[in-house]
Each structure stands twice: as structure tokens, then as C-alpha cells.
């Protein structure tokens, strides 16, 4: 392992103090490079390094500040993650202001991450009832912290540490090392060498959301769940889809599959605005 390799590993870490700390750890094990004879050994070494770094700094957060709709917000996220900046840049495309929210309207947020969408809606429309689902434990815990950090009434948002699937199975969640919002249940980040350790999570179905929470009408379904939208929406009872008035979110995968899913949902949900992800995953 060379100095250039070390710099390539740490360049993306957003905080200098942490970046320098990680660099020192890597310098201390540079001699490992002398014993590596092939690319497989190097790959194993790199994965081991990332595992050590992750375990050491797993519970470290940073605070992200932004203004949404003229309202000031602060959010905790994993110290390695750049997700909040990305979500912030996407907020305008969701066009929430076009929705005529009324007292008691229900919002379902599938793929809540650390809460940026749900907290924005709760702050701007405090008369809503929001049900948010986030399967990654660290994201879920930061979501709860962010509710308190932004002085949101806890009665507005109910957060569940659950994935949504077609069959309530336990899921294995794989997360990119530097993207807390990129966790998925299909392990399709195959090109990344910066994967966190996988974790196991529980799941319920889309229809369970309605049944378990006595929901008859959903004003807004927001969905951004890294490819799980296909099994979630295709397996949903069409009556529950019909009971969703608006849908906002992101579809992943190859273009023809995204358009097919959009057309399917458009048969049942009146108002849909979807962002197509630029990823190339063959979902």
C-alpha cells in the first residue's frame, strides 16, 4: 500500500480531523503491502481496513444545516455519509407545494433515511400524520434524534425501524460506506469497494402499513427505497394504491422497467411525480 493508495481511500471523508485520524491508521499498516502478492489479497486487505474504520467510527455523527422552504433545519447523519446534501438537492423535484394538504392528511414515507422529507413536511404542515419507515438502525436512531433536534411534535411523525417487502421476510441490508441513503436489500452495489458490513432487518408489506395503522386514505406516498419499489408496489393491493392520492419519489434500475412501473402506478394513483435515478443497476 502506497501513500497514493491511502489518499485514494480517505479523500472523500468530509472532516479533516477524522480524515487525518484514518490516514494515520493506514500509515501504521503500510507494511502490509509488502506481503500482498495478488489483487485478491489487496482486495481483502482494503475490505478489512474499511471494516476497522467503520467499527471505530460507526456511532460518530455530524450535523448538517440547511434551509427548506424558508425554514431552518439541522440533521444528524453518519460522519462518513454525503446523503443529506444529495437529498437536499432533490427536494425541489418532489414539488410538495403543489399538494393541497389538509388537517388530518396521512403521509407514508418509505425510505425515510434520517428524516429530511418527513421533518420538512411535519414542520411546514404540523396538522399531518406521518408514518415513516427506515430499516437501517443507525439511520432510524438519527431520525429520532432529528425529530427532537428540530422540535417536532412526536405525535406528528411515527417512525418504524422496518423495511417494506412483498412477503414480510427478514432482509439483509447492504450499505455503501459513504452513503447512508444507499442501503438496499439486493446487494447491488457490487462495484463498490467501500461497503459497510451487512445487517439484518425485519420487514412488513405495503398493505400491512394500512392495516396496522388503520389508514383508509393516504394523501401522499413518498417512496425512495433503492430498488425495493418494484416488489413493494407490484405486490400491493390495488385498492390501497387507489387510496393514495399523490406519489413522490425515485425509481431505480434500467429505463424500461422504471417506465413500466410508473405506468402501472399511474393507473391507480391520481398524481405522480417521480425522479428516475441515474444508476445502472439491473433490477
Predicted regions and their residues:
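S-adenosyl-L-methionine
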Residues: 1-127, 131-136, 141-145, 151-153, ...
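Glycine-rich adenosyl-binding loop in Rossmann-like folds that engage adenosine-containing cofactors
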Residues: 70-99, 160-208, 212
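Active-site segment flanking the S-adenosylmethionine/decSAM binding pocket
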Residues: 100, 106-118, 125, 182, ...
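Hydrophobic packing residues within well-ordered alpha-helices of enzyme cores
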Residues: 121, 143, 147, 171-173, ...
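Residues at the starts of beta-strands that form the adenosine-phosphate
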Residues: 129, 156, 246
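Feature marks short, surface-exposed loop/turn motifs that line or immediately flank catalytic pockets
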Residues: 139, 166-168, 229, 255
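Short, hinge-like loop/turn segments at secondary-structure boundaries
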Residues: 148-150, 174-179, 239, 265
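Conserved SAM-binding strand-loop segment of SAM-dependent methyltransferases
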Residues: 153-161
Amino acid at each position: 500500500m502506497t501513500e497514493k493508495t491511502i489518499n485514494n481511500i480517505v479523500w472523500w471523508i468530509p472532516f479533516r480531523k477524522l480524515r487525518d485520524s484514518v490516514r494515520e491508521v493506514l500509515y501504521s499498516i503500510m507494511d502490509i503491502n509488502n506481503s500482498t502478492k495478488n489483487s485478491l489479497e489487496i482486495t481483502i486487505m482494503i475490505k478489512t481496513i474499511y471494516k476497522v474504520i467503520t467499527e471505530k467510527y460507526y456511532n460518530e455523527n455530524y450535523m448538517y444545516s440547511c434551509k427548506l422552504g424558508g425554514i431552518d433545519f439541522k440533521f444528524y447523519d453518519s460522519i462518513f455519509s454525503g446523503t443529506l446534501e444529495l437529498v437536499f438537492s432533490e427536494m425541489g423535484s418532489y414539488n410538495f407545494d403543489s399538494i393541497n394538504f389538509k388537517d388530518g392528511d396521512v403521509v407514508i414515507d418509505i425510505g425515510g433515511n434520517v428524516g429530511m422529507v418527513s421533518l420538512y413536511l411535519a414542520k411546514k404542515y404540523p396538522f399531518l400524520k406521518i408514518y415513516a419507515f427506515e430499516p437501517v438502525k443507525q439511520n432510524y436512531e438519527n431520525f429520532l434524534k432529528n425529530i427532537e433536534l428540530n422540535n417536532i411534535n412526536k405525535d406528528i411523525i411515527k417512525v418504524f425501524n422496518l423495511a417494506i417487502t412483498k412477503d414480510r421476510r427478514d432482509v439483509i441490508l447492504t450499505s455503501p460506506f459513504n452513503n447512508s441513503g444507499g442501503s438496499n436489500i439486493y446487494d447491488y452495489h457490487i462495484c463498490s469497494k467501500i461497503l459497510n458490513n451487512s445487517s439484518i432487518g425485519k420487514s412488513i408489506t405495503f398493505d400491512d402499513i394500512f392495516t396496522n395503522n388503520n389508514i383508509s386514505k393516504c394523501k401522499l406516498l413518498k417512496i425512495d427505497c433503492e430498488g425495493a419499489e418494484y416488489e413493494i408496489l407490484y405486490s400491493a393491493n390495488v385498492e390501497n394504491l387507489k387510496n393514495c392520492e399523490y406519489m413522490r419519489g425515485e425509481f431505480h434500475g434500467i429505463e424500461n422497467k422504471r417506465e413500466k412501473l410508473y405506468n402501472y402506478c399511474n393507473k391507480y394513483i391520481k398524481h405522480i411525480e417521480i425522479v428516475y435515478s441515474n444508476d445502472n443497476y439491473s433490477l
